Amino acid sequence: MTRNSPSKDLIVVSAVCVYDDAGRLLTVRKRGTDKFMHPGGKPEPGETAAETASRELAEEVGIDVDPADLKPLGSWLAVAANEAATDIEATVFTAPGTWDAHPSAEIAEIRWLDLTAELPDDLAPLLTDHVLPLLAKK
């Protein structure tokens, strides 16, 4: 992973791939934004990447997964979806099993993606540039 350019800010985040019983991938759109992304967010002081992912998953969509049960998928540098002149350094996990999601107040909308269908054009760069190509190889 190469570092961002000096003219860009860098945000560290954790995110989680969550699937429903039809094999669709959960994406969320946060209030005041226009791109869909994984559930996830920034760490609290002292949190590991997995602890952050677990906490954010519970806060955003009501899914409780023990951090130890999250499986690392990868870490990437990507353009931030909703913040200008900003990159994200994202650690992405996969949650075991299948889930139902219930959006919290900070989530404007959830959408389940059928990975075998044509994908919408309002997805975050982390998804389109890194995660979805990796999932397509599996």
Predicted features along the sequence, with ranges:
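Nudix hydrolase/Nudix homology domain
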Residues: 31-36, 103-138
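Conserved Nudix-box catalytic region and its N-terminal flanking loop in Nudix hydrolases
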Residues: 20, 24-60, 64
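A short coil-to-beta-strand element that immediately follows conserved catalytic motifs
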Residues: 64-74
